[in-house]
Amino acid sequence: MIQSFTRLNVADNSGAKEIMCIKVLGGSHKRYASVGSVIVASVKKAIPNGKVKFGLVVKTVVVRTKKEIQRKNGSLVRFDDNAAVILDAKKDPVGTRIFGPVSREVRYANFMKIISLAPEVV
């Protein structure tokens, strides 16, 4: 469950290491984001010479959350960290690699490029 001011790890090689959620997109008063949701975030930690610089405002999609996700079959899925992937204007990932597992709910949100780059889909 991601809300404003939540800090997330970045699960790609775009150059950012940590971001902070500014706004959850999708509706006028949407408070929480889950896996597959698009958020607006600010880059709080970045590596030098990366594609994404410190302080840049970016759109990201959440790929892992500590809060469990209930599937239709009754099973629960949760991860060890909150993580997101940075998107460009065409909703494709900025980075060329994805690190760590990605939840299957990202596929249902139609981010197929992220699913194809991910090493593991849970």
From Swiss-Prot:
Part of the 50S ribosomal subunit. Forms a cluster with proteins L3 and L19. In the 70S ribosome, L14 and L19 interact and together make contacts with the 16S rRNA in bridges B5 and B8. The gene is rplN. It comes from Helicobacter pylori (strain J99 / ATCC 700824). InterPro entries: Ribosomal_uL14, Ribosomal_uL14_bac-type, Ribosomal_uL14_sf. Signal peptide: none annotated. Keywords: Ribonucleoprotein, Ribosomal protein, RNA-binding, rRNA-binding. One of its GO terms (cellular component) is cytosolic large ribosomal subunit. SMART domains: Ribosomal_L14. Belongs to the universal ribosomal protein uL14 family. Binds to 23S rRNA. Forms part of two intersubunit bridges in the 70S ribosome. One of its GO terms (biological process) is translation. This is Large ribosomal subunit protein uL14. It comes from the Bacteria. GO terms for molecular function: large ribosomal subunit rRNA binding; structural constituent of ribosome. Pfam families: Ribosomal_L14.
